[in-house]
Regions:
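Nucleotide-state sensing region of NTPase/ATPase domains
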Residues: 47-121, 127-129, 138-141, 145, ...
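Walker B catalytic acidic pair
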Residues: 305-307
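An accessory alpha-helical subdomain
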Residues: 115, 121-213, 224
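Low-complexity basic/metal-binding stretches
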Residues: 362, 366-368, 374-383, 388-436
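Conserved lysine of the Walker
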Residues: 36
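Conserved H-loop
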Residues: 332-334
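Conserved NTPase motor "head" modules and their coupling/switch loops across ABC/AAA+ ATPases, GTPases
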Residues: 1-31, 170-301, 310, 318-322, ...
Length: 436
């Protein structure tokens, strides 16, 4: 599947953005806090319906604006599709122009695999991140999964509330059986889904990890759950009922599930180095990509947020050369020059995106630099040195993305402008002397 076009309006630090995307590799580079991750976030939002950075949609709206809009055009199984998400007072989702009531209807339309800097800590942090990893993958492939997960969460909250009422208001414990039954009903389905996909990952991850490490390490995954059978689940709830009442929270259930990764027989979480953690997480993500591909019959979209900073130049190139026909979106702080690969390289500056091409052929770059330079020259005329510096600093950022030939052309143009300004300044000074 492919994303062919991305439109953004009033999202994060973007006013308006319209990008026709490459069907292979799209690289967005620039300094920190320029808006690179916001592009990844907008695609993720159109796939999952939620941001991976915040739970509050209001925070996604550009400062001083009251709405945002994202529109993605994509191709899947040789069919064109369009997803639009708008937010003003609340979030509205449109699929092919038709408004949908539940964000769960969005899941599976655009399949993605995302790798963010926080994912490095999947194995180091608590089980919550590992469950989230499974939830994002499964919800894209099994529409009923997100429903079961939401209902389980709702039932869990109700049971916890009743546990507190038993403690404070001395209510009957008999009603807990009702919540226990519902927890089992939804928990059983969630457990089966998770177990199914853990097994699928197990089949893929060892071969993938051997390719990443050169065949030097053996990797295994163990799924840990309180949910093995109906009798066992009820027994654990009964055994921990007194403790649950004291704490006002449910201590057993699929909300406590986890999985452990072993590297050469040792727990990576406990004994793995930082480098080993990185390679294991990379193997997990690539296994996720292969599982989704097997399920839907085509490659999902791969989103890599600041992932390339973890790899040296040679490994970056090798990785991008070996991802097959997957469409990739990469953000990084440095330019990545890839020869003989189908790619678009974009420079992101202050919420503006510039496609890196020959300078002369890209009128947008020329117009932008020219307007910045002319503004700075006018302001330097009025002796606003600070403003002059700020404008030329912006121009310098943009110049760093140009080729040597383009920089040479820009220098000649800039020299001419400065010479013109100097002569104008001298004429003005002579005129002022005459007036005096």
């Amino acid at each position: 599947m492919l994303i062919t076009n991305l439109k953004i309006e009033n999202f994060r630090n973007y006013n308006k953005l319209n990008l026709n995307l490459n069907n292979k590799i799209n690289i967005f580079y620039g300094n920190n806090a320029q808006g690179k991750t916001n592009i990844i976030e907008s695609i993720f939002l159109c796939s999952i319906g939620k941001s991976f950075r915040t739970s509050k949609d209001k925070e996604l709206v550009k400062f001083d604006k009251d709405f945002f809009r994202i529109e993605v055009q994509y191709k899947k199984s040789d069919r064109d599709g369009k997803i639009k998400i708008e937010y003003s007072d609340k979030k509205h989702i449109f699929i092919n122009g038709i408004k949908v009531k539940k964000f769960s209807e969005l899941l599976g339309k655009i399949n993605i695999v995302i790798f963010t800097p926080d994912d490095i800590n999947i194995l180091k942090n608590g089980p919550k991140m590992r469950r989230r990893f499974l939830d994002i993958m499964i919800s894209q492939l099994r529409p009923n999964y997100i429903y079961c997960l939401n209902m389980y969460t709702k039932t869990l909250e109700q049971r916890n509330a009743y546990l507190k009422q038993i403690k404070l208001e001395h209510k009957s414990e008999d009603l807990l059986d009702l919540w226990n039954q519902k927890l089992y009903e939804y928990g059983e389905k969630i457990y089966k889904y998770r177990l199914e996909f853990i097994e699928k990952i197990k089949e893929k991850i060892n071969d993938i990890h051997k390719k990443v490490t050169g065949g030097n390490e053996e990797i295994k995954i163990e799924y840990i759950s309180d949910f093995s059978s109906e009798e066992n689940f009820y027994m654990q709830l009964k055994q921990n009922q007194k403790i649950d009442i004291i704490r006002g929270a449910t201590s057993k259930g699929i909300h406590k599930d986890d999985f452990i990764v072993y590297l050469n027989g040792k727990n990576v979480n406990t004994y793995g180095s930082q480098g080993q953690n990185r390679t294991v997480v990379l193997s997990l993500k690539m296994s996720e990509l292969q599982v989704i591909k097997d399920e839907i019959g085509e490659n999902p979209i791969l989103l890599l947020d600041d992932f390339m900073s973890e790899l040296d130049k040679e490994r970056r190139k090798n990785f991008l050369e070996n991802i097959g026909d997957t469409q990739v979106f990469v953000t990084c702080t440095d330019k990545i020059d890839i020869e003989n690969l189908n790619s678009n390289i974009y420079n992101v500056i202050d919420g503006e995106v510039f496609l890196r091409k020959d300078w002369k052929s890209n009128g947008k770059i020329w117009t932008w630099i020219q307007s910045r330079a002319n503004t700075s020259l006018r302001r330097s005329w009025s002796c606003k040195k600070k403003t002059w510096y700020v404008h030329w600093k912006c121009i310098y950022k943009r110049i760093t993305s140009l080729s040597i030939r383009d920089c040479r052309q820009l220098c000649w143009w800039g020299f001419g402008r400065l010479l013109y300004t100097y002569r104008s300044y001298n004429r003005a000074r002579e005129y002022n002397n005459c007036v005096r």
